[in-house]
């Protein structure tokens, strides 16, 4: 076994919770010649569904909606199809993060100067490519009324979006391949077997053959959504068309929507489109000179993100990057390209704070009134929503086993071992507003890092734990001098100064279009419908109202699946939204983010109708979401 492999395996030992082994396919995919991708000359004048954003959630939404053959679906993606960078897929999975710096496939947005981080401006990369941010991610996978959004249902959705085909005997003969079928349905066995019995050959190469697009699905790359045009004749405004451009110098193009517009532009893109369309906080719209079509204070608010950094140690052993940089024959082998070299652990507050935890939590809670001063909006509904999420974090998350810190081992530098720590449930909140009225100018992004002092306290305790891990065997035998920040940085004040100058985003922002009651600053209801509209939904990670103890890739796929399933059910008359407290103009709230809900299922003309009784906290979904 290669020496770097031995080192990586040895380094895993101190971690109590490890990442599931995720197969890393090293084959380069051939580019399919027949897909749903079109150019502007093939556009129709109208579509039933227009999906703004072809990322993790948007493509799932489009795929599911197009399963109804009697509807038409259009995806407008600002980025390219990705064909021009397809050959880069041969790289080791942990090297893909370098593509974040590639302006052709990444939005290199910048934050405002962060006053609590030594006035630094941070880069926020996200995928500018069909497929979204998962196309530039460095990690492969992670793992509440009618309870579409509770843990059990959402976990089932996360399992549904993952598929597995057992290896053939030919593949099994190459190595010892094992797998667990306990979570699979009977169709995984009966389906392929029946197909083979009917004369359909099973392919040995999962990437072989040609992909054919659905005839009722069109995907248009290099199409930036400029705004939504509204019909304001009713109490709930209705999207009547979507305007897009290929570039800032291109003329505007308008496409009529027959049924619904689904925003899937992500945490930055979705609120940006809404603001440019005249929907959002009236103060933000008026300041930008945009006509206020609908005053919805929550648009762009409640922004939150994982923030972290790493401590580095020198090592004389070869690391992943040592091999990558060598250009050796081994660095090009399937063994290397499919090798997983990271380990991960999640740590709760009890482990971080020890006996001081109870008093520390009391201090945080007793200073809530001061916490409101750090929220960028003074709107009463935004403050009410923050109070609700603040209570969940400080009353439920903090004293429980729910992790507050992610610890990640990284070998991404030559002859260097890095142990990273990242905050999982920040109390700090930011916002997305406008820099200009152009869709081609990035909006103003202010994540408000460390605006609440508790976030800095937790992360500082995490770095102290990182040093304890590094001193434990067997990892200690491989580590030399601490190269950054160095052992001289040891006091709380010194660590604070170092963090302010060095922490960075973990690229897991969410919350800017939160699924909360309107009275708590919410933007969408439990059906993903934007309050005050009749046919605009948001289906992406921006609707999650609270950060989770996980990466956001898999949840983004899952929210796309769940959102599209709801949209299909509603438009096909299977799901009823009548008598729901989450209707698009609902504004009342219990004032709590945790409430029970019940489901009643009745028969209505042969169809199943589901009636939702009360809004339940989507936040409860994440109480156990600590999988990677």
Regions found by a protein language model. Give the residues of each.
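N-terminal redox-cofactor-binding region of secreted/periplasmic oxidoreductases
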Residues: 3-587, 591, 612-627
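Long alpha-helical scaffolds
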Residues: 257, 606-607
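Juxtamembrane low-complexity tails/linkers enriched in Ser/Thr-Pro and polybasic
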Residues: 593-606
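Intrinsically disordered, low-complexity Ser/Thr- and acidic-rich regulatory segments
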Residues: 1-6, 599-601
């Amino acid at each position: 076994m290669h020496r770097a492999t031995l080192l990586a395996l040895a380094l895993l030992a101190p971690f109590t919770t490890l990442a599931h082994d995720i197969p890393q396919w090293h084959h380069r995919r051939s580019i399919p010649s027949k897909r749903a991708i079109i150019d502007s000359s093939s556009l129709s004048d109208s579509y039933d569904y227009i999906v703004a954003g072809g990322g993790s959630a948007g493509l799932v939404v489009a795929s599911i909606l197009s399963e109804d053959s009697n509807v038409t679906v259009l995806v407008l993606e600002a980025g390219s199809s990705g064909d021009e960078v397809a050959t880069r897929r041969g790289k080791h999975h942990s090297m893909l993060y370098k593509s974040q710096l590639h302006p052709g496939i990444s939005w290199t947005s910048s934050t405002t100067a962060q006053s609590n981080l030594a006035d630094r401006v941070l880069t926020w990369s996200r995928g500018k490519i069909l497929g979204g941010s998962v196309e530039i991610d460095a990690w492969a996978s992670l793992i509440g009324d009618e309870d579409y959004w509770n843990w059990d249902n959402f976990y089932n959705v996360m399992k549904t979006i993952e598929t597995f085909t057992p290896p053939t005997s030919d593949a099994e003969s190459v190595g010892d391949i094992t797998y667990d079928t306990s979570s699979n349905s009977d169709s995984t066995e009966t389906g392929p077997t029946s197909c083979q019995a009917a004369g359909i050959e099973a392919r040995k190469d999962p990437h072989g053959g040609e992909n054919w697009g659905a005839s009722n699905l069109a995907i248009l790359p290099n199409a930036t959504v400029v705004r939504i045009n509204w019909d304001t004749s009713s109490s709930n405004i209705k999207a009547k068309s979507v305007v897009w451009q290929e570039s800032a110098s291109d003329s505007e193009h308008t496409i009529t929507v027959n049924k619904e517009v689904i925003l899937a532009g992500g945490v930055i893109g979705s609120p940006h489109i809404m603001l440019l369309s005249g929907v959002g906080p009236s103060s933000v719209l008026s300041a930008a000179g945009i006509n206020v079509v609908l005053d919805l204070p929550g648009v762009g608010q409640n922004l939150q993100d994982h923030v972290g950094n790493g401590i580095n140690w020198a090592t004389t052993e070869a690391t992943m990057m040592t091999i990558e940089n060598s250009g050796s024959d081994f660095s090009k082998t399937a063994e290397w390209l499919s090798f997983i070299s990271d380990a991960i652990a999640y740590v709760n507050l009890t482990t971080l704070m020890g006996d001081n935890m109870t008093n520390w939590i009391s201090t945080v809670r007793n200073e809530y009134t001061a916490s409101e001063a750090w929220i960028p909006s003074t709107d009463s509904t935004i403050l009410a929503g923050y109070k609700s999420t603040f209570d969940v974090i400080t009353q439920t998350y903090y004293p429980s086993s729910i992790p507050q810190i992610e610890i990640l081992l990284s070998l991404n530098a030559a002859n260097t071992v890095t142990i990273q720590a990242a905050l999982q449930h920040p109390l700090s909140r930011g916002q997305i507003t406008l820099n200009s009225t152009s869709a081609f100018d990035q909006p103003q992004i202010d994540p408000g890092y460390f605006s609440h002092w508790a976030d800095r306290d937790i992360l500082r305790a995490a770095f102290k734990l990182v040093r304890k891990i590094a001193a434990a065997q067997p990892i200690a035998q491989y580590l030399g001098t601490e190269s950054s920040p160095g052992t001289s940085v040891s006091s709380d004040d010194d660590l604070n100064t170092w963090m302010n100058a060095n922490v960075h985003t973990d690229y897991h922002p969410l919350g800017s279009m939160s699924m909360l009651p309107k009275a708590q600053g919410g933007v969408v209801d439990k059906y993903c419908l934007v309050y005050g509209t009749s046919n605009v939904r948001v289906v992406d990670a921006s609707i999650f109202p609270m950060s989770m103890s996980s990466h956001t890739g898999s949840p983004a796929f899952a929210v796309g699946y769940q959102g599209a399933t709801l949209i299909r059910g509603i438009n096909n008359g299977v799901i009823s939204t009548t008598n729901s407290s989450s209707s698009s103009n609902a504004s009342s709230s219990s004032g709590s983010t945790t409430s029970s809900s019940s489901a009643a299922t009745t028969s209505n003309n042969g169809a199943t109708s589901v009636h939702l009784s009360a809004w339940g906290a989507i936040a409860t979904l994440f109480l156990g979401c600590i999988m990677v």
